[in-house]
Amino acid sequence: MQCFPRKWELNTNTVAGAGLAFMPETQYDDRHMKRQPTRSKAVTHERIVDAAARAIRRSGYAGTGVADIMKDAGLTHGGFYAHFPSREAMLAEAADRAGAAAVATSASIIAAAPPEKSLQYLLRAYLSKEHVADVENGCATAALCSEMPRQAPEVRRSATRRIKEMIDLVARQLPDWGKPRAHEQALVTVATMVGALVLARAVDDGRLSDALRKAALNHLSPSTD
């Protein structure tokens, strides 16, 4: 069963390179030359955001420093403020990037599943032993939710937007999709998924960790076994 693999994370080259095709490479007029620094800056910006998105999942918001991020991105500390007005602005983009990766991964798992089993596939992947172990490449909400109340408004806003997307994605997999109770079911499902993952990662008892995630899985989708 698939977990949350690194290959489904947002691809920096794809994002940063999306605008490179707007002007054919055969045009070398002044406009083309003037745009090169802007494009180079955009690519560098994406590298920083990707490094920060990995770091916040690995070390948390409090453990993510500007110097370490720039080093991880292969850049000097002094260039940071050419891309962000503050550390909080970087964290907001990182939270958005990490949250988007989790939603994209979930959507990919659902797309690969038979329609009638899409939620089961997602639950089994999300609550897998592999996902418990893979904090750096896993769900950003589970990795960071305990720190969220202490973050700047722009960071919380970015994270909240992606949480809402996950809730909506889950709601669309429910048999009652389109009815008022589907949204409530989705809220309970996502809260249980995330809470079980947080606890399974928190404890130092392997048996308890397995019991937590399996209990949540059986509660949310009893027919998966």
Q: At which residue positions do the language-model features occur?
A:
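Basic, helix-initiating cap at the start of DNA-binding domains
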Residues: 3-59, 63-72, 89
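An amphipathic alpha-helix adjacent to DNA-recognition modules
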Residues: 42-50, 62-63, 74, 82-107, ...
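Solvent-exposed, amphipathic alpha-helical segments
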Residues: 51-58, 105-108, 192-199
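Key DNA-contact positions within bacterial/archaeal DNA-binding proteins
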Residues: 78
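Hydrophobic/aromatic-rich alpha-helical bundle segments in the mid-to-C-terminal region
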Residues: 152-161, 173-225
